[in-house]
């Protein structure tokens, strides 16, 4: 049986990236929470 996680960089960024987070109100809340906590990487887009 095939495993469920088949990683794709493009999909990962499209779903969890900075631009994706900014497009929804809740996504912006996620970024605000991560900024408040002092995360060095806000989204997967920053992992470069």
From Swiss-Prot:
PANTHER family: LARGE RIBOSOMAL SUBUNIT PROTEIN BL34M, MITOCHONDRIAL RIBOSOMAL PROTEIN 34 FAMILY MEMBER. Keywords: Ribonucleoprotein, Ribosomal protein. Signal peptide: none annotated. This is Large ribosomal subunit protein bL34. GO terms for cellular component: ribonucleoprotein complex; ribosome. The keyword Isomerase does not apply. GO terms for molecular function: structural constituent of ribosome. Belongs to the bacterial ribosomal protein bL34 family. The gene is rpmH. It holds the Pfam family Ribosomal_L34. GO terms for biological process: translation. It comes from the Bacteria.
